[in-house]
Amino acid sequence: SPEKFLEPKFEPEIFFKLRKKPHSEMSDVDLISCCESFGIGVELVQSIYEGWIFKLPDTVAGFGLHGQYKILEETEIPSDENNRVAIIDELKNFNLTLRKNNNILERGRSSNILEKSPLAALRSYIEFCEKNSDWLVLNGPITTGTITDAYDINKDDVFSLELDCLFKKRFIVKF
């Protein structure tokens, strides 16, 4: 329910779940082999700063503006290397169409995440954890950043998102 958040916004995000500790110098195939699964979800972000007017350091004080993350679909990483390579390629090249109340808001793409892909965000997280090992999360979702801009959520809004690969179906989120 959006009412329990402060000026909530909607963001689609890819996530990974690590099953073993990776290192930042691994190839993409080795890195994804450390994951038990990946998936698509949505994050509700919020701002304690009225009108979403703040400076970058304020996001730390606002706990990264995180509200809640909801997993929409999760897929196990296959054991076959050819299938892993195919997933890596799709993670680097997907497009996502985001709609609100049947109106297209934006067409996002994988390269919107750190100007590269969700794997680049996962690798950046691993680099951070190599210096801050207490932050490493195993068996829990590691989100990779929004694929589109964040959009306002109001009561009774219906969002849908559709990817051209990875998960070939439309996901509906109702408020």
Identify the role of each PLM range.
Residues S1-S117, L122-R123, A150-S160, K168-F175:
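Catalytic-core "active-site belt" of small-molecule-metabolizing enzymes
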Residues P118-N154:
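A conserved acidic, glycine/proline-rich C-terminal tail/linker
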